[in-house]
Amino acid sequence: MNEQYSALRSNVSMLGKVLGETIKDALGEHILERVETIRKLSKSSRAGNDANRQELLTTLQNLSNDELLPVARAFSQFLNLANTAEQYHSISPKGEAASNPEVIARTLRKLKNQPELSEDTIKKAVESLSLELVLTAHPTEITRRTLIHKMVEVNACLKQLDNKDIADYEHNQLMRRLRQLIAQSWHTDEIRKLRPSPVDEAKWGFAVVENSLWQGVPNYLRELNEQLEENLGYKLPVEFVPVRFTSWMGGDRDGNPNVTADITRHVLLLSRWKATDLFLKDIQVLVSELSMVEAPPELLALVGEEGAAEPYRYLMKNLRSRLMATQAWLEARLKGEELPKPEGLLTQNEELWEPLYACYQSLQACGMGIIANGDLLDTLRRVKCFGVPLVRIDIRQESTRHTEALGELTRYLGIGDYKSWSEADKQAFLIRELNSKRPLLPRNWQPSAETREVLDTCQVIAEAPQGSIAAYVISMAKTPSDVLAVHLLLKEAGIGFAMPVAPLFETLDDLNNANDVMTQLLNIDWYRGLIQGKQMVMIGYSDSAKDAGVMAASWAQYQAQDALIRTCEKAGIELTLFHGRGGSIGRGGAPAHAALLSQPPGSLKGGLRVTEQGEMIRFKYGLPEITVSSLSLYTGAILEANLLPPPEPKESWRRIMDELSVISCDVYRGYVRENKDFVPYLRSATPEQELGKLPLGSRPAKRRPTGGVESLRAIPWIFAWTQNRLMLPAWLGAGTALQKVVEDGKQSELEAMCRDWPFFSTRLGMLEMVFAKADLWLAEYYDQRLVDKALWPLGKELRNLQEEDIKVVLAIANDSHLMADLPWIAESIQLRNIYTDPLNVLQAELLHRSRQAEKEGQEPDPRVEQALMVTIAGIAAGMRNTG
């Protein structure tokens, strides 16, 4: 174990030294000495030296305004480098990869050892694998794209330096390159000056596809194929690609007025343009590689006399011409020019697939399988995974926007106000109109701008090539009419196919009613006819946790899924559950394997569809090798969950969860909603107000400009508490509820649940991880520096609660200390704390100075503002999960 860490530690310290030299060259010896002093004080403060802790506080409080930014940047950049070293460690032969035998191989061996599972059953489970990852542009990706590129290069240098056999001069060249990259990063502003537009966010998503997924997906399929051949003697069919990517960037308009129908249309075109760009590079390689002459009669018939000399090349050159014509047409459309569609415009995946597959089959038929299974196979798999759209997009809109639009329409038509009708009347009207042959929208009606926007979006969906839009997600869905309304609006736009429409249930009440809503929908004949046996439902993690606390929310999510699975099974409907998880615990984030195995039995039968958010995209898919390992983890977990489903919880366990849910929700809401001091405390003890100034995502941080916790989006709400290290949303209420159940004499039941029920043990594991990242002395320091004395008792009460919670969680899990079973994560947190602590102390100081200036009516000092932004970004890097 320790040898593994020593490789990581030596990389971290080497990068730290290079950063130190860079700082010295840029700003002089005295700044480097100041940074070094702070680092040493932080290290011994962590080791329990109280005198040094006090000195650390004093040193940071006494920094001059000129020293603030360099010190903040030094620690922030150091954390970015530490994260890069850790990311490399996870794929390095000396690091995690060494002790982490292939996940898929391990899973297959485990499955083969189960007497009740035949090899045939395992093969069938592999063939029904389906994994759809939905990339979302959450404002949590704090790091600028330009710095991400530099970190990818640093990673490449670490990989080459790991090679023992490199010559001295190569070693020196690599070290020089590292110094250049770290100097470039130091002299680059790490904070964006402007908020990204939705189109910028979409381009960020395409960059992930190009830099990592394009290579990562074929590599993952080769790895999967190798393991299946080795363990089951089974080869993957060429057309089998179980993984798809969808994006919310440019499609998610919920609470984001910047995402309009025009933006969505633009992003769809841009995505297709990027696909032609990437496929052209692939085809160029194939034109030069496929110089073979021998071909079966079928292929020769296809190419005719003209192509007989080099049939494969001939087909590839034709495909290249079509791609170029398509690209030119898309480029003109992006510039706003209207051109007639060219001959051979590519709009469907089959048009890409057919010539490539014809070459593949011919090469196989002529005994050239070794050539067929090279670059050509990778390109075929990319066609299946990415295809003409590159990434499909989801459209997401809030339910009330559809209700408002229909209300405006019915008032215009003089048939009443749809908004004020009962649910039964709404359904009757919608079903009548859905069955009607005549259009509902009057020709010369001039709707309001809001309604026009909703109708235009439906128009974009109807005009887009089928297959480029994956689903229409309705946020804050509460009733069957919410779903029917969208189907009606799409019908009016003239859509020619059945678009999957997924209700998103995201508050505690909505999760509890989800099954009832879906049962009513499935009882409508028209609806059953439309969906053709398939239904997608989205489960919201972040808003339910913000509404009711993490314990009550996770139980409501479990029960909603459980009930929906049963209802759909009974009705013969294939259910896809779409999980809206974030990177952080308060938004449902958990290590993939644990999270999937803790879902109700049967929840992955219809495949897995899950959001990948913000900075998690970079941690999980930032490099091709990491993509392979993330996709393999998901694959192993889905196979295991489907073939060895977790046990059904005992009735007594369900009753305990009901009890925990009620108690924890009461405690959580008692503070967050009912305690009059809570919102003022949140505003002063965390950088919640200041976060609004960070140019993070294209979406505003609040749903309404004024208002309390409920109007804050889930992401800034969690972000704020992560910054001051209290991590409140991820634990408040949970421990108190557990303590109460222990006092009622049920500790042994809780211990059994922890041992034998993955759902419950994952909950406790996630609490331990949060407690390991939280820090009570830092949270207390924020109070002392920033909070009105009248509110100190509330802060103290919350910190005492957390201390009690840690004790009860350790007692139930039978652990002597936090994260006992995951030493690697504990090590990683400790390693980063030394650099995150000074940023926290400095942030409290900066907030103090900036608020003081505001109170005295002075203009904010730009040095203080800039340093504050840097500490926010740095702590986010240190915590490895922001919102």
UniProtKB/Swiss-Prot annotation:
Catalytic activity, EC: 4.1.1.31
Example of a GO biological process term: carbon fixation
Keyword Magnesium annotated: yes
InterPro entries: PEP_COase (IPR021135), PEP_COase_bac/pln-type (IPR022805), PEP_COase_Lys_AS (IPR018129), PEPCASE_His_AS (IPR033129), Pyrv/PenolPyrv_kinase-like_dom (IPR015813)
The protein's required cofactors: Mg(2+)
PROSITE patterns for this protein: PEPCASE_1 (PS00781), PEPCASE_2 (PS00393)
A GO cellular-component term linked to this record: cytosol
Keywords: Carbon dioxide fixation, Lyase, Magnesium
Single GO term (MF): phosphoenolpyruvate carboxylase activity
Class in the EC hierarchy, top level: lyase
Pfam families: PEPcase
Catalytic site positions: 138, 546
Statement: the UniProt record of this protein carries the keyword Isomerase: no
Function: Forms oxaloacetate, a four-carbon dicarboxylic acid source for the tricarboxylic acid cycle.
Family, similarity comment: Belongs to the PEPCase type 1 family.
Database matches in HAMAP family: PEPcase_type1
Protein name as it appears in the record: Phosphoenolpyruvate carboxylase
Natural source organism: Shigella boydii serotype 4 (strain Sb227)
